[in-house]
Amino acid sequence: MLIKLLTKVFGSRNDRTLRRMRKVVNIINAMEPEMEKLSDEELKGKTAEFRARLEKGEVLENLIPEAFAVVREASKRVFGMRHFDVQLLGGMVLNERCIAEMRTGEGKTLTATLPAYLNALTGKGVHVVTVNDYLAQRDAENNRPLFEFLGLTVGINLPGMPAPAKREAYAADITYGTNNEYGFDYLRDNMAFSPEERVQRKLHYALVDEVDSILIDEARTPLIISGPAEDSSEMYKRVNKIIPHLIRQEKEDSETFQGEGHFSVDEKSRQVNLTERGLVLIEELLVKEGIMDEGESLYSPANIMLMHHVTAALRAHALFTRDVDYIVKDGEVIIVDEHTGRTMQGRRWSDGLHQAVEAKEGVQIQNENQTLASITFQNYFRLYEKLAGMTGTADTEAFEFSSIYKLDTVVVPTNRPMIRKDLPDLVYMTEAEKIQAIIEDIKERTAKGQPVLVGTISIEKSELVSNELTKAGIKHNVLNAKFHANEAAIVAQAGYPAAVTIATNMAGRGTDIVLGGSWQAEVAALENPTAEQIEKIKADWQVRHDAVLEAGGLHIIGTERHESRRIDNQLRGRSGRQGDAGSSRFYLSMEDALMRIFASDRVSGMMRKLGMKPGEAIEHPWVTKAIANAQRKVESRNFDIRKQLLEYDDVANDQRRAIYSQRNELLDVSDVSETINSIREDVFKATIDAYIPPQSLEEMWDIPGLQERLKNDFDLDLPIAEWLDKEPELHEETLRERILAQSIEVYQRKEEVVGAEMMRHFEKGVMLQTLDSLWKEHLAAMDYLRQGIHLRGYAQKDPKQEYKRESFSMFAAMLESLKYEVISTLSKVQVRMPEEVEELEQQRRMEAERLAQMQQLSHQDDDSAAAAALAAQTGERKVGRNDPCPCGSGKKYKQCHGRLQ
């Protein structure tokens, strides 16, 4: 109560921010007559003038009124469009490292031109981030004339572009691209073998469109570049045959419940659990198929890979549904994004799940992957000096934006008041009753010429509604992942009188639904339209537009509530743009996933008490409140998961930044000999210490062991025992110096043969390759550690602290291994003539290119964190702890690569 009173007196923080910014808007408006007097050349010349002022030390913020006034005037001349005052407010919010919540249809694309222009004046580059390639290309092409009129360059960063084209796009003042492509380019740059292979500049200012989709919905899914691991496709096929024999039971076995099935599914956490009966049956079937020996246990260490295959196959059959989670197209399993309903070509689930789904669908099984580099969007976007974003729905997630990204949310007022009617939810007992009610509503609306947009949460549901509409004889368009190419065209015409459009989730985001349909699309369809034709099309459109407004505007139907209120609000936001009339209603049933998992008992009890008849719906504020509470539960759970993921990834992030910064320094220098000399001293000191402990008696020295180690690891054949026999006065310090001097001498002789330049080139190559190889192993080990770290909780230890402690010691061990392997490799190298070295280098480059082509981009969910990490680890674990390490170092496995585990 007190807070409400204070807010009334002083205004909310949002009100105070807008009040302050409105003063600047008044200054910009006052400059308009002055700007109108300028010629095109003078207006364009303002860009050079602003840049000169910045170079002299003027602060960017001081340029806001003039810069915004220049962009507004240029937009009037180039597009015939003048920025509204609320768009100027939005532009200022975006410049202040904030998130601007602007309703659908308020012109976010035009608003973005203001902060993009202002921040491009610094010459450090602006990245405009969109959710898909179509929007990146559309926005870049639409805004290019404006930016080029003002003397700025525009680049587009698309997947599959060659490196020179990407470099050119990044060198532009303003670059448009998707979040995935920016992230993957960052990872690829940090895997480059020469400075010329890198494409990105230093990350300066990111302006993220649909910021909620990118920074929240996709935050749980790291970007991964992976290379192929060993082939185990045959095993997936064999295990896949067994799974259909298992029967699902409703819930997990407990003291009070014993089911008859073989596995249960936890829909909340999307996990599958085998029962005791299921385990016994699986083991029997594996023995029968000849996959496992009689008397063996599936849980024995020898069968850990088999357990991995069984778990993946079980999840593929029980949790992943065709046309909901993925589609099969041209013999390939393609993931469907749960948030947007779009297909994600080239993305693959990890942990063997994708292969298990391929086996289930009977398509060709592709190899498993091993992680080469990965980063989460949360950590990628926090690398920018300045970050801002815009969306139609951010206020519900304001706390998360603030706590994770340190971004405040400012709600920008609409240009015209919103008059859309949001009708209360209707809840039915069954799915069939709900669908029937939706069909009746559509019939009623279209009969009076009102366009209808039906939002569904999966391809399967959109096809179900489509079939029912076809049976009822209602013409309609379907917009889902399967019809991706027609997306913008279908959305543009969804406002046609009596048009019915079915869309999965937020497919078509970024394209406005214009009441009466899009007259621009009709003009674009004509080859050479005359002025008369265009006028006629516009006149016809005006008649249709008025008719649709008269009928009540666009009507939105939600076929079920999404887990997130924000996505429901996005669907509603497609209607009522720029003060247009419109309406919306959600239809629910007790069989919907959200109701079944989170709100069932209370609401179904209420419905039974009311004695509802088939086909009747309940419409009550209590029900709406119960559903909102269910959504809040899911949202807070998802927030906890994202926060947890970030806390763990922050540990890896510190290490990633250290490694990438080291790697970039290496790439930028041509001579690393000083570093090599310093490392050599450290390595030889540590090696000698193992056999001649410092300040020890000669009786404690292991000279034969030292000689053998130097021979095996550094190709140094030194007669140390002879030296000691012939020179009794040779003490420890002198001996150490002599061994190091001998190693340097041998190395210098090699350098004389091949030449200093070639040796420097070779040293750099060895350091980069060794670093990449060890970093890849370290990532797999970190994934493996992460998978089991929660078990430390049972020992009363904090898993996060344990993860930090262990990962740090693993990182330190990796850096030690790096030094050792670099010196060992350089010492063992057999010198050849320069021509031979060049030939070998050429072969290495070809091999690196081949590997790059084989690399696949995969996008993994947080609960499957290690791409084939188990495969990598168990392959290593077959070596005994006390056996010699397979890398050939001569050390025991536990003292060499075994340390990573």
UniProtKB/Swiss-Prot annotation:
It catalyses: ATP + H2O + cellular proteinSide 1 = ADP + phosphate + cellular proteinSide 2. It comes from the Bacteria. It is found in: Cell inner membrane; Cytoplasm. It is an enzyme of class 7 (translocase). Residues 891-901 have a biased composition (Basic residues). Its main location: membrane. Induction: Repressed under conditions of excess protein secretion capacity and derepressed when protein secretion becomes limiting. This is regulated by SecM. Keywords: ATP-binding, Cell inner membrane, Cell membrane, Cytoplasm, Membrane, Metal-binding, Nucleotide-binding, Protein transport, Translocase, Translocation, Transport, Zinc. ATP binds at Q87, G105, E106, G107, K108, T109, D512. One of its GO terms (molecular function) is zinc ion binding. NCBIfam families: PRK12904.1, secA. Monomer and homodimer; probably dimeric in the cytoplasm. It is not yet clear whether the form that functions in protein insertion is monomeric or dimeric. Part of the essential protein translocation apparatus which comprises SecA, SecYEG and auxiliary proteins SecDF-YajC and YidC. Makes direct contact with SecY. This is Protein translocase subunit SecA. The lineage of its organism: Bacteria, Pseudomonadati, Pseudomonadota, Gammaproteobacteria, Enterobacterales.
